[in-house]
Amino acid sequence: MSGALNAFTIKGGFDFTMDMRRKDRHITQPDRIVSIIDGCSVCRIAMQDGEGLYIVPLSFGYEYSGVDNIKLYFHSANEGRKLRAITARPDVAFEMDCMEGITQGDTACAYSCAYKSITGTARASIVCDTEEKQRALSLIMEHTVKKHFDFNSEQAAHVAIIRLDVKSISAKGSD
């Protein structure tokens, strides 16, 4: 990928340069990154609390208005370990991937996975604004089931919405 970016500068001047061994698999084009996000149905959030490391897979929705402005949204119960961890330590990591199949070979070591993946870091927050919660719920449903739903304020009040403001992102794939 000659001429491709090796790093993204994300909000706040954060540079993320992945020292990736397989440079031929590093995906840096914003449109391809968005395509990978579109193809993933689950995002895992990794966080830490007083009990230790914690990772949880969640369905999600997102807003993209440039590689330096990606917001991932998740819904949750209004209480629990995840919310306590985010409140205590809002810096988190995330991962999503799309397995596209198995590449077969003549020997066991020649087999491989065809995949695309995204990893990154983010600042997590609990959304309190009712309109943003309603929009986030709609985004989650649009991404998950490819259908638009509207939510009223009462429905939004019954769930917690977690927003990840992406600070760094890296994509990789086996094209």
Model-derived regions, located:
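Extreme N-terminal tail/first-helix region
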Residues: 7-38
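Helix-adjacent hinge/juxtasegments
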Residues: 75-76, 81-104
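Charged, gly/pro-rich active-site loop segments
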Residues: 14, 19-24, 99-175
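A generic structural signal for short beta-strands and their flanking turns/coil linkers
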Residues: 41-43, 54-56, 68-70, 88-92, ...
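Short Pro/Gly-enriched beta-strand edge/turn motifs at strand-loop
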Residues: 27-28, 39-44, 144-147
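A generic structural signal for nonpolar/aromatic side chains embedded in well-ordered alpha-helices
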Residues: 36-37, 85-86, 140
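Short beta-strand segments
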Residues: 40-78
